[in-house]
Amino acid sequence: MTAIVELKNAIKIVKNGFDEEKIILNDVSLDIYEHDFITILGGNGAGKSTLFNGIAGTLPLTSGSIRIMGEDVTNFSPEKRAKYLSRVFQDPKMGTAPRMTVAENLLIAKFRGEKRGLFPRRLSAYKEEFQATIEKVGNGLEKHLDTPIEFLSGGQRQALSLLMATLKRPELLLLDE
């Protein structure tokens, strides 16, 4: 069986304000297979988000390699990244457009990584689908399709972030706290 994620000897070193090096990830290796649920535990500043950023291909490692579906994640185009992985951030404001409505944010998530265009026409075409999906999740979002997300509660924003991350049914879902 081929691993969905292959993390080999990942090292991430950063420099602080005094030009001193700090090791954030130290020789981390991990294979994740289809249907695996992996929990990464650690205190604040332990490197969990750094690890997720590396897996997502948004933060280069100092050394080591990360492969998703057999391909080096650093070579992924935005389209390929959107196809294979999705993410929910610690802060539910990240990855969303606060002044846009719930429905508009869901539309962006649905077509993330694809060519832009036809936004208003697509929104009306998908509103019923989003309504049905939201009703399954609950958390009061079904009443807020036309509400800018800056007016949602923290829990509703987090539920929206999770819904946005799962819309494309990615191979890999990264949940950061």
Predicted regions located by residue number:
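A short, proline-enriched helix->beta-strand linker immediately N-terminal to the Walker B motif
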Residues: 165-171, 177
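ABC ATPase NBD coupling module
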Residues: 18, 60, 72-86, 94, ...
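Helix-to-loop junction immediately C-terminal to a conserved catalytic motif
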Residues: 56
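Conserved ABC transporter NBD signature motif
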Residues: 64-72
